[in-house]
Swiss-Prot record:
InterPro entries: ARM-like (IPR011989), ARM-type_fold (IPR016024), Importin-beta_N (IPR001494), XPO4/7-like (IPR044189). One of its GO terms (cellular component) is cytoplasm. The lineage of its organism: Eukaryota, Metazoa, Chordata, Craniata, Vertebrata. This is Exportin-7-B. Keywords: Cytoplasm, Nucleus, Protein transport, Transport. SUPFAM superfamilies: ARM repeat (SSF48371). Mediates the nuclear export of proteins (cargos) with broad substrate specificity. GO terms for biological process: protein export from nucleus. It is found in: Cytoplasm; Nucleus.
Length: 1087
């Protein structure tokens, strides 16, 4: 132990400094000393002394948190007796000290929960010593209110702790503990909690009694934790609860069939203080979401009836809903009425007509208060969206009344948004239109709601649009209109254009009629007429939000009415012809292109408009028939012949803008490339003509690089814009003839400029990232476009350039030294990731025979591979999996290397081989299925290589194995634990986890077993003996069947047989382990 911490008094002082001081250096010194204390051998004994004798709450907190760390560590865990003693000590300590600071009590309860969870399967004399949780807290529950609060907190924290996976322990162990806790304790805890709540609700709560309030709050938290439990291990994503079903076990049926459980929470809502009711509503949300299969039809109807009655009672007494938290939870509860029940079931509820009226009134009122709780409104719109979507399918004879109430909801949404515009402008409030994500989400919901009783929606939109458009036109004609009034009308029109786009996008082909298509035509005509008006004013003024709404409208219109699948006889086109003279799709496409060119001309410096305009162009260029119609338009030919900054300002060099703003240029040139390819064929003259602006830009850059004194910033911007343009063209050119023209254009003339830029600006990712991404595109053999003639050396020359760029960048980026964590990815790891992608694409493209490089003494392949190794070793293992793009590019490259270049892997230094094997081992348990599958493939290639080499070395005849093979075998024999660990990991995943890629996992497993027969036998015995005695024979038989008919080779036939056996094995093991209470603790080899 270091000198600074000699006594309890010193520890007390350090705790005070850590938690109270405002001086940073003092706090850091205290933190450092306390970290040393935590890691010291006497930490455990001194923690007990601190709890016994410490005079400050902070020292008690330190002791509790240190003990929690000690019991949580997976390496060198505390002995069982010691953990039992700590658990008992915590229970006694809290039982004798009810007046501790709340944060100390919470820390000790957390300690109890952690010990109990991690020791759940620990047994002593055939007794699971950590499972008697209700017995542990009974003495607290039978005492005063203060003690009862502590007892309930124990159960609440434990339920929460067991429900949460812990990154430091295997997911398999977490799920086994959670499942066992669910089956053996959770229902008893839930029942106890409900009973205590019933007792509490039966008494009149003293509003002044804080301890009673604490008890009620803890009971509600406990109940919510029980209902929120991840019963079947599927709730990994908590970011969305729209379609959440609570998978209540069948053994809990009695509690939900008893209507008093549901009634308890509705009664509590009406009887307890408002600050507790959000939790009550949260519990009701979970109860309303119980899985449908828990009930038969009659039981579900009865349950739903009680639920709807409770909702009705809240709506009839809405006073508490003025609280934002109550309001939010109640909106969630309403949404669950439709996400978990069918409209046909709802309409059969006795009070349905009254309830749907109350819900409609509540929704209308909520929407009218547009400034209030937009996140809660999401759930209301979700309810109405699902109700409206169900109308075509409902078969019940009872009226659903949605034809009455849905138009009211639509009208309320539309009119409230329009009315908000004036208030926002007048009071300088935050504009909802600034939150594009929220607006889009609401519009997606409205698109379905608005299509219900569409004639009413359309009539409303036409009336409001005509009104605003007429006022807007009059204001413009007056010439002296106040800017405020103009802004109001532009804001209203912005909302209307967004909403019109949404309801058109909500058209469903099988449910739409000619009349509805004609109504769409009415709306489209109005938007296009407005566009003509606003475009005519762009030289003087424009409104960015209105333009963005137009682009949103065009996108929806394109999806529904432009393309190969649309019936051209649509009544919409007839209406467009009558009003605007647009007779067919080609004429409508000319409107699209005209708008795109207008936007690029006037809004070239506005990134949001430019990027969305170019995305629209890109989407239009994908359709097979539409792209052929587009090419015939004079406006498109103009773009193909005049793609310069003179006509399109966003192609210019703007020193004020960010270089990342140039990304949209790639989208532009991808679209132009597709349009050019329609008629390009092998016309080199047409290609050269198209490339003239880029040729001029490259020649200009070449002159800059040749002169000693050039403007570096200007050169960078020119180059970045150019490579982004080229990447777009390269992406679009997926035919051999066009791609070969591009290749001949760029190589050898301009490739040296890219190499020179990497040398000069390797430290600037704004410059290197686009260049490396262009290289990745050029070497990508998409659609077999890189098929060089047999007499052409271009494949090898292209790889040489690739190798040169990777080597240049790799060697220089490694000179950057230590980088701050927050800049590491941007400055280094992103570039490394792209280099891995470049190398993978080049190695797997099948256009280079890599055997010739060594044959002719060409170092290009070796240089690239050695650079890969250097870059890899500069990246810590943890970073490989922490950054998804890096992990995906690394593991996909490694897959190619182990498949085609195993001799290179085998020739590496031992520490490099161990690094690669460790990365595969860690990747096997990655959450990303793509990474996990790649690791299985890598492991399979390595194991197959090992097996073949061992088989050859066992035979006397034939040539001796290469030197690198012998070295590799020697390294593997020196470190058998690495392959053995991977064998246990793969088997562990297949037996105990929800294995999503079973086929991939099966491929390396046979090789691993054949290479480690003795270890596999031990592992198998360990797994069998860890089962309860009555299950051991069945598990033994599973393993026997797994190896039934399997020979000692890795021939395809034998592998396929093993894969089939493994599928049966997994099914049999799962059946065998059902209802088993065995635990991982007796199976250390598996963890």
């Amino acid at each position: 132990m270091a000198d600074p911490v000699q006594s309890l008094a010193q520890l007390e002082i350090l705790c005070k400094q850590l938690y109270e001081t405002t001086d940073t250096s003092t706090r850091l010194q205290a933190e450092k000393a306390l970290v040393e204390f935590t890691n010291s051998p006497e930490c455990l004994s001194k923690c007990q002394l601190l709890l016994e004798r410490g005079s400050s709450s902070y020292s008690q907190l330190l002791a509790a948190t240190c003990l929690t760390k000690l019991v949580s560590r997976s390496t060198n865990p505390l002995p069982l007796e010691q953990r039992i003693d700590i658990r008992n000590y915590v229970l006694t300590y809290l039982a004798t000290r009810p007046k501790l600071a709340s944060f100390v009590t919470q820390a000790l309860i957390q300690l109890y929960a952690r010990i109990t969870k991690l020791g759940w399967f620990d047994s002593q004399k055939d007794d699971f010593v950590f499972r008697n949780v209700i017995g542990d807290v009974t003495r607290f529950l039978q005492d005063s209110v203060e003690y009862c609060v502590i007892g309930v907190s124990f159960l609440s924290q434990l339920t929460n702790e067991i429900n949460q996976a812990d990154a430091t322990h295997p997911l398999t162990k977490h799920r086994k503990i959670a499942s066992s806790f669910r089956d053996s304790a959770l229902f008893d805890i839930f029942t106890l909690s409900c009973n205590l709540l019933k007792q509490a609700s039966g008494k009149s709560l003293l509003l002044s009694d804080e301890s009673q309030h604490d008890l009620l709050m803890q009971l509600l938290k406990l109940t919510h934790n029980c209902l929120n439990f991840d019963f079947i291990g599927t709730s990994t994503d908590e970011s969305s609860d729209d379609l959440c079903t609570v998978q209540i076990p069948t053994s809990w049926r009695s509690a939900f069939l008893d209507s008093s459980t549901l009634q308890l929470f509705f009664d509590l809502y009406h009887s307890i203080p408002p600050n507790f009711t959000p939790l009550v509503l949260s519990c009701l949300v979970q109860i309303a979401s119980v899985r449908r299969s828990l009930f038969n039809n009659a039981e579900r109807a009865k349950f739903l009836s009680h639920l709807v009655d409770g909702v009705k009672r809240i709506l009839e007494n809405p006073q508490s809903l003025s609280d934002p938290n109550n309001y939010h939870e109640f909106c969630r509860l309403l949404a669950r009425l439709k996400s978990n029940y069918q409209l046909g079931e709802l309409v059969k509820v006795e009070n349905y007509p009254e309830v749907i009226r109350l819900i409609a009134n509540f929704t209308v009122t909520s929407l009218q208060h547009w400034e209030f709780a937009p996140n809660s409104v999401h759930y209301l719109l979700s309810l109405w969206q699902r109700l409206a979507a169900s109308v075509p399918y409902v078969k019940a004879t009872e009226p659903h009344l949605l034809e009455t109430y849905t138009p009211e909801v639509t009208k309320s949404y539309v009119t409230s948004r329009l009315e908000s515009v004036h208030i926002i402008l007048r009071d300088g409030l935050e504009d909802p239109l600034e939150d594009a994500g929220l607006v889009q989400q609401q519009l997606d919901q409205l698109s379905t709601i608005g299509r219900c009783e569409y004639d009413k929606t359309c009539a409303l939109l036409v009336q409001l649009f005509d009104q605003s458009a007429q006022t807007y036109q009059e204001l413009l004609q007056s010439g002296s209109a106040p800017s405020m009034e103009l802004a109001v009308q532009e804001g209203r029109l912005t909302w209307l254009v967004y909403i019109i786009g949404a309801v058109i996008g909500g058209r469903v082909s099988f449910a739409s009629t000619d009349e509805q298509d004609a109504m769409d035509g009415e709306l489209v005509c109005r938007v296009l007429q407005l566009m003509n008006l606003t475009d005519s004013r762009l030289a003087q003024a424009g409104n960015e939000k209105l333009e963005l709404s137009m682009l949103s409208f065009f996108e929806q219109f394109r999806k529904i009415y432009i393309g190969d699948q649309v019936q051209k006889s649509s009544k919409l086109y007839r209406r467009l012809s009558d009003v605007l003279g647009l007779n067919d799709e080609t004429m409508v496409l000319s409107i699209f292109i005209g708008k795109i060119i207008t936007n690029l001309k006037y809004w070239g410096r506005c990134e949001p408009i430019t990027s969305k305009t170019l995305q629209l162009l890109n989407d239009l260029s994908i359709g097979y028939s539409s792209v052929r119609k587009l090419v015939k338009l004079s406006a498109v030919q103009f773009m193909l012949n005049n793609h310069t900054s003179e006509h399109f300002s966003f192609l210019g060099i703007n020193s004020q803008s960010n270089m990342s703003d140039m990304r949209c240029r790639t989208t532009f040139y991808t679209a132009l490339g597709r349009l050019l390819m329609v008629d390009l064929g092998e016309d080199e003259e047409q290609f050269s003509q198209f490339m003239m602006p880029l040729t001029a830009a490259f020649e200009s850059l070449a002159q800059m690089f040749n002169s000693n004194n050039f403007n570096e910033q200007e050169a960078k911007r020119s180059l970045v814009g150019l490579v982004r343009d080229l990447r777009g063209i390269a992406f679009a050119f997926n035919a051999k003839s066009s791609f070969m023209m591009l290749f001949d254009w760029i190589y050898p003339a301009y490739m040296p400029i890219l190499q020179r830029a990497i040398e000069l600006w390797f430290h600037d990712p704004a410059c290197t990232t686009p260049i490396l991404k262009l290289m990745a595109e050029l070497v990508h053999n998409r659609s077999q476009r890189l098929q060089f003639d047999v007499s052409s050396p271009n494949g090898i020359l292209l790889f040489r350039e690739t190798s040169k760029m990777i080597t240049t960048y790799g060697n220089r980026i490694l000179t950057l030294g230590e980088l701050p964590k927050e800049q590491l990815y941007v400055l280094k790891l992103k570039g490394i990731s792209i280099c891995f992608s470049v190398l993978k694409a080049a190695l797997s493209g099948n256009y280079v025979n890599f055997g010739v490089f060594r044959l002719y003494g060409d170092e290009a392949l070796d240089n690239a591979l050695q650079t890969f190794v250097k870059l890899l070793l500069s990246v810590p293992h943890s970073d490989l999996l922490d950054y998804p793009k890096l992990s995906q590019s690394y593991y996909s490259l490694l897959e190619v290397l182990t498949q085609d270049h195993m001799s290179f892997i085998a020739s590496l230094e031992p520490h490099v081989i161990m690094y690669i094997l460790s990365s595969i081992s860690e990747g096997l348990t990655a959450l990303d299925t793509m990474v996990c599958t790649g690791c299985c493939s890598c492991l399979d290639h390595i194991v197959t290589y090992l097996f073949k080499q061992l088989s050859r070395s066992g035979k006397k005849r034939g040539a001796p194995p290469p030197q690198e093979s012998e070295r590799f075998l020697h390294i593997m024999q020196q470190h058998p634990e690495m392959i053995q660990q991977m064998l246990s990991t793969v088997l562990n995943i297949i037996i105990f986890e929800d294995c999503r890629n079973q086929w991939s996992m099966s491929r390396p497993l046979l090789g691993l077993i054949l290479l480690n027969e003795k270890y596999f036998s031990d592992l198998r015995s360990s797994i069998v003996s860890s089962q309860p005695p009555e299950k051991q024979q069945a598990m033994h038989l599973c393993f026997e069947n797994l190896m039934e008919g399997i020979e000692g080779n890795l021939l395809t036939k034998n592998r396929d047989r093993f894969t089939q056996n493994l599928s049966a094995f997994r099914r049999e093991v799962n059946d065998s382990m059902k209802n088993s209470s065995c635990g991982p603790n007796s199976n250390e080899m598996m963890s």
